[in-house]
């Protein structure tokens, strides 16, 4: 063989060995276990148990239980339960010595019956039910009253406060404004009146000055351009 063929065959040899080893293991196991399964149909108790390595010389033996060798179930005390369930008020149970013992009857109801309540009504004191309408009024907590603040020249109107009943308190203005758009501040009213007078006088002065200037210019025009008078001269008759 050539060197190229040898190089191609050498990597395949380990894979072939692994395949041969894997395929040979299950065949050996099946050959050893097949006679036992054919003879009995199930693993016998007398045959030696196999270990994981496939050898039969294992000193330890595992006991396999079959449905035929199931241990009997312990008997449950059903009779005692039936006797306890059948026991009621006034019923008798058999004791250990063959005698029948009576159970103590259950006590009466925890709550009194309606008949007992009706019988005890005359003996009980009558307690009036509380009326929500006639409940005593709670004392109102007094709030500290602060003195009114001094109203400045540009102060806004005081805020309304709520009474204890939930109604707003209408503040009483200390000063009635001159116009509706003014606030309740006397200093603001004075400032408004003074500014109105100053603006009125300034407009009057401006109007008077404009009239005086316009009248002077008209008079000067007349002096520089006097009016021409036409006079009828007598005709000369020769």
From Swiss-Prot:
Q: Per the UniProt record, which residue ranges are transmembrane?
A: 190-210
Q: Which GO terms describe its biological process?
A: symbiont-mediated suppression of host chemokine signal transduction pathway
- Acidic residues bias located where? 78-88
Q: Which residues lie on this side of the membrane: Virion surface?
A: 25-189
The record's subcellular locations are: Virion membrane
One of the record's GO cellular component terms = virion membrane
Polar residues: compositionally biased ranges: 28-42, 49-68
Side of membrane Intravirion, spans = 211-238
Q: Basic and acidic residues compositional bias: what residue ranges? A: 89-100
Asked whether the keyword Transmembrane helix is assigned, the reply is yes
Source organism's superkingdom?
Viruses
Kindly give the membrane topology term recorded for this protein: Single-pass type I membrane protein
Tell me where it mainly resides: virion
Q: Does the keyword Transmembrane helix apply?
A: yes
Q: Which residues are sugar-modified?
A: 28, 49
Which family does the record claim for this protein? Answer: Belongs to the alphaherpesvirinae glycoprotein G family.
Q: What does this protein do?
A: Chemokine-binding protein that inhibits neutrophils' chemotaxis.
Q: What is this protein called?
A: Envelope glycoprotein G
| Species, as recorded | Human herpesvirus 1 (strain 17) (HHV-1)
């Amino acid at each position: 063989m050539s060197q190229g063929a040898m190089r191609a065959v050498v990597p395949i040899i380990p894979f072939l060995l692994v395949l041969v080893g894997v395929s040979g293991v299950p065949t050996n196991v099946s050959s050893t276990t097949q006679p036992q399964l054919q003879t009995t149909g199930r693993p016998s108790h007398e045959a030696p148990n196999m270990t994981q390595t496939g050898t039969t010389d294992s000193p330890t033996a595992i006991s396999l239980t079959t449905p035929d060798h199931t241990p009997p179930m312990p008997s449950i005390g059903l009779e005692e339960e039936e006797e306890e369930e059948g026991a009621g008020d006034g019923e008798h149970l058999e004791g250990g010595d063959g005698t029948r013992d009576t159970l103590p009857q259950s006590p009466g109801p925890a709550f009194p019956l309606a008949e007992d309540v009706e019988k005890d009504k005359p003996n009980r004191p009558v307690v009036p039910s509380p009326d929500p309408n006639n409940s005593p009024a709670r004392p109102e907590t007094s709030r500290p009253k602060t003195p009114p603040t001094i109203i400045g020249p540009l102060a806004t109107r005081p805020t309304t406060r709520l009474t204890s009943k939930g109604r707003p308190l209408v503040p009483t203005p200390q000063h009635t404004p001159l116009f509706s758009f003014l606030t309740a501040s006397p200093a603001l009213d004075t400032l408004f009146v003074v500014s109105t007078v100053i603006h009125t006088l300034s407009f009057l002065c401006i109007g008077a000055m404009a009239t005086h200037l316009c009248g002077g210019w008209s008079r000067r025009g007349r002096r520089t351009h006097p009016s021409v008078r036409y006079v009828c001269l007598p005709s000369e008759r020769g």
